[in-house]
Amino acid sequence: MAAETAQTSAPSTWRLGRLTVPLSIWLPLVIFALTRLYGFVVIALAARHQVALPSPAHPGIYQFAAHPSSPGYLGLITNWDGQWYERIATLGYHLPAVGDPHGKDALWAFAFPPLFPTVIGAMMTVTGLSFAVCVTVVNLLAGAAAMVVMFALIERTAGRFAAGTAVLFTSCFVAAPLFQAAYSEAIALLLVCTVLLLIARRRYCWAVVAVILLSLTRLVTPPLAIVVLVHAVVRYRGRTEDPIRRSEMVGMAVLGVVSLASVTLWSTITKVITSGVKATGADRGSVSNAVIVGRFGWFTNAYEHIGWIGVVGVALLVVLFVVVAISPVTRTWGVEVRTWFAIYPIFLLFVAGVHAGVFRYFLLAFPLALLLVGSPEREDIPRKRAIFVVAASVISLALQVPWVSHALVVTALAGKPWLP
């Protein structure tokens, strides 16, 4: 065993003049900065192959601001959903006038929750900077903060090695370039990690605020209700040694209800704004709408393409996530991280279809990275596992090249492009 592990040797602090920065801050920031620099190079090189947009070869791709061919880094990061966010940041949400030829676009914009484009739009107004520059600043700041919070969340129970692994692999994940593109993933990850950390620290009222903000960013709050439930059960079981105050009971109950119900917050607001206009896209991708139309994500896709064998296979995946979550492999992760590890991918299996865009959904499934290391002792760095983590991260970085080239870039090649 001694030959396989080594004591941590990284400096616990980093001095910048008179400022002392702890490892829990500088390490995730350095990892995020270096990987985003790599992402800049990958995106900038891939931009050379982008066609001019809008393009008659791709009539189904919405384009708010026309781009020339080879638009450069700042042009490429605003592709796809970024065009809808640019529209909202520039024009806001509004109802179309009667006879407006672009009326469907105005209504479809309601499909995108408001927090991310509102922040970008406010920055554009205050600074006068372009949409792409504001996106870069906001997402890099949000992504960096997300990594610091993620590190703190995991380090508290699993130690620095596990926390560093989660930050490293998440930053190197195949879809991680979206942390610097015009997508809401960076803010969403920051809010998810913040909610989990606040629950772990029993700051339930602040967690409610973070959940509401998350519901206005991405429709992923229902799994957090399960996290709150499991957290409450664990606290109830240990109430003899750790009594639960009445205010904490109320806080957990409110947090659970808000987590479950807030997934409909934006669609409810939209219905009020549109006053019954049926053409709005606000329910696109929502949990309730998926159930109403009889779509159950991977289960439906598996049945349509493989039959009941496929459904059974997806069901076994659900069981596998639960089994791993309660196994010794995850024993040091903390109940909140263990629960999110299982319930968020299960949530995706039920509500997200099988398509190339699923890679970006898994950016929020950051505990999956911990499977690379399991639950080592807090103060140890298992050498073999460390090598495995580095190798997996390098491979993932390499895979970013084809992913960006095929998913983020719109090329002149025939056929339907991948979706980021």
Task: Place the predicted regions along the sequence by residue.
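Transmembrane-helix motifs of polytopic, lipid-linked glycan transferases
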Residues: 120-125, 134-157, 322-324
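Short acidic/glycine- and proline-prone juxtamembrane loop motifs at membrane-interface regions
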Residues: 181-187, 358-359
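Membrane-interface transmembrane helices that cradle and orient dolichyl/undecaprenyl
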Residues: 158, 195-206, 376
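Short hydrophobic/aromatic helix or loop-helix immediately within or flanking a transmembrane segment
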Residues: 76-98, 102-128
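Signature aromatic-anchored transmembrane alpha helix within multi-pass, membrane-resident enzymes
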Residues: 253-260, 378-411, 418-419
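Transmembrane-helix signature of polytopic, membrane-embedded enzymes
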Residues: 129-134, 150-172, 190, 339
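Membrane-lumen/periplasm interface segments of specific transmembrane helices
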Residues: 35-56, 214, 221-342, 399-407
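Start-transfer (signal-anchor) and selected internal transmembrane alpha helices
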Residues: 1-66, 251-255, 385-391
